[in-house]
Amino acid sequence: MSNLLGPRDANGIPVPMTVDESIASMKASLLKKIKRSAYVYRVDCGGCNGCEIEIFATLSPLFDAERFGIKVVPSPRHADILLFTGAVTRAMRSPALRAWQSAPDPKICISYGACGNSGGIFHDLYCVWGGTDKIVPVDVYIPGCPPTPAATLYGFAMALGLLEQKIHARGPGELDEQPAEILHGDMVQPLRVKVDREARRLAGYRYGRQIADDYLTQLGQGEEQVARWLEAENDPRLNEIVSHLNHVVEEARIR
């Protein structure tokens, strides 16, 4: 029973759980093995269900967390990652510790949402113990009330080291000394973004991006070149889209 209540200091006050150095080194090896997949167990410590709604939205086909190998499991004994939501209430402190102790080492702990991070707006209630880090060691904090699905995926990417992989990724034949090419560098970046967004709004993501690139390339050689390009293409739909893009450019020049 004392293990379920957790460690206490000399005055009998409960203190957060800790892990020794061997488990910390095992956690580093775990990250190498689960970079492409992870089993997650959710621990509700006493939240309002707002965070749960966003978690389920993250698992929906729209955001599709499983494309990163993130899967929810029904038991902490199957989990690589424990996701703690809500402020830790006194009633849920022992069940949360049981879940943490049931998950095999090494494991990754994520504190989810403002309540999980610090207790949130409930931090000073008599029945609230505090944030997740008051009972277990936390590896990643995902702030928000509640966090968006995009922030949720970002937090999982941080936990799994996916962002580090993306940052240091190299393409085929990519050289360190090869500078990155900036497309349409003669135009200011906000204007390039506006033209690209307008073209994608009118023609869809794929063809809109292609039209925006072609338009900016021709515009860099002068407005006469844009007219010659439209004449060569002889496409009324392209003419209409380019007229909208010309309007975007003219508005930017006036400002």
Swiss-Prot record:
Keyword field contains Iron-sulfur: yes
GO CC field: formate dehydrogenase complex
Residues given in the record as [4Fe-4S] cluster binding sites: C45, C51, C115, C145
Keyword set, alphabetical order: 4Fe-4S, Iron, Iron-sulfur, Metal-binding, Oxidoreductase
Cofactor names: [4Fe-4S] cluster
Source organism superkingdom: Bacteria
Cofactor note: Binds 1 [4Fe-4S] cluster.
Molecular function terms from GO: 4 iron, 4 sulfur cluster binding; metal ion binding; NADH dehydrogenase (ubiquinone) activity; quinone binding
InterPro entries given in the database record: Complex_I_20kDa-like, NADH_UbQ_OxRdtase-like_20kDa, NADH_UQ_OxRdtase_20Kd_su
GO biological process: anaerobic electron transport chain; anaerobic respiration; formate oxidation; glucose catabolic process
Family annotation (Gene3D superfamilies): 3.40.50.12280
Matches recorded under NCBIfam families: PRK06411.1 (NF005012)
Family recorded in the similarity comment: Belongs to the complex I 20 kDa subunit family.
Subunit structure: FHL comprises of a formate dehydrogenase, unidentified electron carriers and a hydrogenase (isoenzyme 3). In this non-energy conserving pathway molecular hydrogen and carbodioxide from formate are released.
Designated name of the protein: Formate hydrogenlyase subunit 7
The organism's taxonomic lineage, starting at the top: Bacteria, Pseudomonadati, Pseudomonadota, Gammaproteobacteria, Enterobacterales
